[in-house]
């Protein structure tokens, strides 16, 4: 796994980082977000999704929320899907299979909160592991690693 970034950021810095990341997001990329409750996983994903729409000259989605209860929220971006998963309540890989999780990784962009059950799996795709640690009420330490 190759470390790409290790920064301490406030919200404005997170906005800038999300804008820069979006310029390099490719179809098939998988982003795994780790961090304690309240670390900013959903906030970071919300910024990424909004920026993807802006970069494609499309109106931002009216609402981007955490899929803790539905487990998956899908956003349509031109001819592809953005999948936003929250695996906090998922207890087994069988549950993921029932959601067509592994099939959905192909030809889409996928953001996953609470990916711990996936870390040791061979995802067969480029993926990024993003760890958010709370430093203070307004600052987060963000580590981004890339794996092919």
Question: What kind of feature is each model-predicted range?
Answer:
Residues 31-33:
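Hydrophobic anchor at the beta1->P-loop junction of P-loop NTPases
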Residues 37:
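The conserved Walker
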Residues 1-20:
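N-terminal pre-Walker A segment at the start of P-loop NTPase domains
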Residues 50-63:
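Post-Walker A helix-loop "phosphate-sensing" segment adjacent to the P-loop in P-loop NTPases
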Residues 64-83:
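AAA+/P-loop NTPase substrate/partner-engagement loops
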Residues 41:
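Conserved lysine of the Walker
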Residues 2-4, 92-96, 102-148:
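Short phosphate-coordinating micro-motif centered on Lys-Gly-acidic
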Residues 21-28:
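Phosphate-binding P-loop
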């Amino acid at each position: 796994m190759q470390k790409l970034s290790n920064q301490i950021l406030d919200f404005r810095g997170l906005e800038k980082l999300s804008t820069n990341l979006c310029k390099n997001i490719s179809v098939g990329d998988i982003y795994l977000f780790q961090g304690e409750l309240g670390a900013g996983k959903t906030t970071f994903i919300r910024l990424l999704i909004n920026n993807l729409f802006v970069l494609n000259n499309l109106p931002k989605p009216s609402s981007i929320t955490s899929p803790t209860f539905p487990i998956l929220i899908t956003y349509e971006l031109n001819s592809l899907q953005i999948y936003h998963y929250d695996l906090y309540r998922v207890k087994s890989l069988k549950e993921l299979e029932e959601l067509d999780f592994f099939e959905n990784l192909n030809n889409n962009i996928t953001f996953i909160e609470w990916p711990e059950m996936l870390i040791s799996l061979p995802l067969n795709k480029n993926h990024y592991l993003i760890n958010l640690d709370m430093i203070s009420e307004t600052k987060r330490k963000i580590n981004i690693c890339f794996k092919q």
